[in-house]
């Protein structure tokens, strides 16, 4: 009779475990393989995208108009043709190599422009320092005089201070009929200004004058505007200098105001610009008495501003009429 042998159950279990393990390894290997394939595809696609991007950038023209900022004006830099011309990358490189001399010229122009700009800026700074030093020197040579009697003229005031040193300029300001008038007297050197301080309290007219060091310099008058002959000096006696004129007031309004208050106006020059809120005028009368009467108008309101009137140091010269151009 044949004998039957039974296999142990634990052996069967071990075989099943081995089989399951083998299947798991196959699945893992397949997953790794699929992942590798996916990664490879992604990397390939990324490289293709990068190549496309590089190719696209190569086709861009760096001198195209859209690459320049809004404030850049190609007309001023002779770049009109270059800014509006589109070139492929290869053609652009070829053109650049062929026109290397032209690019060098542009670089030289830019370099020269930069040098000129730096030179101009340095020159302005130097000029500014010189003018500041000159202004400070002028202030040291100037004294401020107040409480000037209405009968005192600039010539009389300069005569008083001429004993202290050479007087190079004298300017009386303020209402000519008020004791609140003041003046600036500039000397040729610091010593004259220093000695002038000792004249404080000196009776000039009916009032003692006060003399102090000035904090400002006298605004110089352009020598070309000063009278050049006796006739022009006589014109100055009939001319007044009017300031603080409302910008809304016209030249006709200024003329009508002074003619109705003082007398006939023969010439009038109304001046102004965008930087100042008010304007100035030079008014020449037919008679010197009219100019004296006009000095009383200082403080009167014309338009919406009180005007300031003082004797003029310069005549109102007639405008030069140029012949029409033949071109």
From Swiss-Prot:
Keywords: Nucleus, Repeat, RNA-binding. It comes from the Eukaryota. Residues 97-132, 308-327 are annotated as: Disordered. A motif (PAM2-like) lies at residues 59-69. The keyword Isomerase does not apply. GO terms for cellular component: nucleus. Residues 141-216, 238-314 form the RRM domain. Residues 97-113 have a biased composition (Basic and acidic residues). Residues 114-127 have a biased composition (Basic residues). It is found in: Nucleus. One of its GO terms (molecular function) is RNA binding. A motif (Bipartite nuclear localization signal) lies at residues 114-125. InterPro entries: CID8-like_RRM1, CID8-like_RRM2, Nucleotide-bd_a/b_plait_sf, PAM2_motif, RBD_domain_sf, RRM_dom. Pfam families: PAM2 (PF07145), RRM_1 (PF00076). PANTHER family: LD29830P (PTHR32343:SF22), SERINE/ARGININE-RICH SPLICING FACTOR (PTHR32343). Contains a PAM2-like motif, which seems to be involved in the binding to the PABC/CTC domain of PAB proteins. This is Polyadenylate-binding protein-interacting protein 9.
């Amino acid at each position: 009779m044949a004998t039957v042998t039974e296999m142990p159950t634990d052996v069967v279990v071990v075989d099943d475990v081995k089989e399951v393990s083998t299947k798991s390894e196959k699945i893992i290997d397949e997953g790794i393989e699929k992942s590798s394939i996916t990664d490879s595809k992604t990397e390939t696609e990324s490289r293709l995208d990068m190549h496309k991007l590089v190719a696209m950038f190569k086709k861009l023209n760096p001198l195209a108009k859209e690459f320049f900022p809004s404030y850049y004006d190609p007309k001023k830099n002779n770049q009109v043709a270059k800014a509006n011309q589109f070139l492929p990358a290869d053609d652009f490189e070829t053109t650049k190599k062929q026109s290397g001399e032209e690019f060098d010229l542009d670089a030289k122009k830019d370099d020269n422009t930069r040098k000129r700009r730096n030179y101009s800026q340095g020159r302005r700074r130097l000029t500014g320092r010189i003018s500041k030093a000159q202004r400070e020197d002028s202030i040291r040579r100037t004294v401020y005089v107040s409480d000037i009697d209405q009968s005192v003229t600039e010539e009389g005031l300069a005569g008083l201070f001429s004993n202290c040193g050479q007087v190079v300029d004298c300017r009386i300001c303020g209402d000519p009929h008020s004791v609140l008038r003041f003046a600036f007297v500039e000397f040729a050197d610091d010593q004259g200004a220093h000695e002038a301080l000792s004249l404080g309290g000196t009776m000039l007219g009916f009032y003692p004058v006060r003399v102090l060091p000035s904090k400002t310099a006298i605004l110089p008058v352009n020598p070309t505007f000063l009278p050049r002959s006796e006739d022009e000096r006589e014109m100055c006696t009939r001319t007044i200098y009017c300031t603080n004129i409302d910008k809304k007031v016209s030249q006709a309004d200024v003329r009508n105001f002074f003619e109705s208050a003082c007398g006939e106006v023969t010439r009038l020059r109304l001046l102004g610009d965008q930087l100042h809120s008010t304007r100035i005028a030079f008014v020449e009368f037919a008679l010197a008495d009219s100019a004296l009467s006009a000095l009383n108008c200082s403080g009167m309101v014309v338009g919406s501003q009180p005007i300031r009137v003082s004797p003029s140091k310069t005549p109102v010269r007639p405008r030069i009429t140029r012949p029409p151009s033949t071109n």
